């Protein structure tokens, strides 16, 4: 089984790199503000109609444009969900959502989290799924990519104050990247058997003679961008373990590739735009090393079987609880690491049913900031924060002013970097503490003891880091949990974007210094090791006490 696991990982990474390389070249053109062939005329028309200016923006203007679009989207989606019963395409006559669930849902889709405190097939109409959630899947993904576009430009421009135009970037990302690729994935899913219709739910007779109501809907179109945009919110409650969303082993493989496709392509684009492709490869090596180790640990933990079942004398040579038999342990383990390394959160197995160590790894991947490939845009700018921190640490060790790609890293940048890195750990630890201190928080736990605490810790980690997956034993659809998680999602998203844009604004105004004999090389294996060590050190120091109370205590008990 070990050989099968390594072959699965190797095949996945090989196909991923082959697909991401050409996409990275296309993204590099967009970062360099070069329209794709044949698109300039369409862009001019689209900007002329609403009268949008395409002039360059400084970091504050760029940030305000991103925040303004997202706040508008949040308000529209919130009221759409409240008044769902007045809107069309609601064949099941589903009522509007409560204010707290509508708020939670609006925030989580705008922030690219897609935490779901509801069951899609019994809560949301087709109109809400399409015009509400799917639209935000595109816009939230485009927002994250636009931020990393601006951040990359900060390293390639010198003595300037502008970082591009947010509206131009958002339009190009959506029209020329997200929509075409999502369309191809959606057509493939439909060909493989995923649903795409507007029929009312179908009553069918089962082989046992009972009657069952099968949900319908425009599934494939939402499923495609859900994966490509690392959104993760399922059309159905079972998410990608549902055969109507993910019908075959081939669609499952394609969905995993879709999750990592843009984050990987952005690393290639980063190297191409900066004029040193080794920089992009350095990031990919660091991410890949952590990723492969994490997949190996989860696979090992899950093939050991469930120790609680073994203690009762049951046959549990592998842990199949909560897993689809058509996918199995190895594929489920790989998917779990893919979806939590990226800020996706889609699942084909119930993470709450993983072994203690098998469930701890996905939780820890979220807690370190979703920087191992990560979300579209957010993963790379999150990892770049650790790059700046690693450069700063190396500068202290050798007694030189830290610099990266020729840009001096001063006190202002390091303060903002520390602020951005500390946002999500603060939310996670304080949110988990608040939940455990209140009756409303503790009453949602399905399990007592360490596993119950793990459910709480996982939920807050998922929300604050904009992942969206869950230990589903937590009953999170209550005013307390909906509001707590909405706050964590909102601050976890925009509380990081704001200092990231401020760092970009500071760096773009600096001159690039030529490399000297004392410059730290940031493309070799030494720096890869330093970067991995920085990520692990920050993650270990921050979360080991909390993890010791949850999954570690469960493993040792």
Curated annotation (Swiss-Prot):
Any one GO CC term of the record: plasma membrane
Membrane topology type: Multi-pass membrane protein
Matching Pfam families: KdpA
Keywords: Cell inner membrane, Cell membrane, Ion transport, Membrane, Potassium, Potassium transport, Transmembrane, Transmembrane helix, Transport
Protein location: Cell inner membrane
Residue spans crossing the bilayer: 5-25, 63-83, 132-152, 170-190, 253-273, 283-303, 329-349, 356-376, 379-399, 416-436, 484-504, 526-546
GO molecular function, one term: P-type potassium transmembrane transporter activity
InterPro entries to which the protein is assigned, alphabetical: KdpA (IPR004623)
Family that this chain belongs to: Belongs to the KdpA family.
Function statement: Part of the high-affinity ATP-driven potassium transport (or Kdp) system, which catalyzes the hydrolysis of ATP coupled with the electrogenic transport of potassium into the cytoplasm. This subunit binds the periplasmic potassium ions and delivers the ions to the membrane domain of KdpB through an intramembrane tunnel.
Assembly information from the UniProt record: The system is composed of three essential subunits: KdpA, KdpB and KdpC.
Protein name: Potassium-transporting ATPase potassium-binding subunit
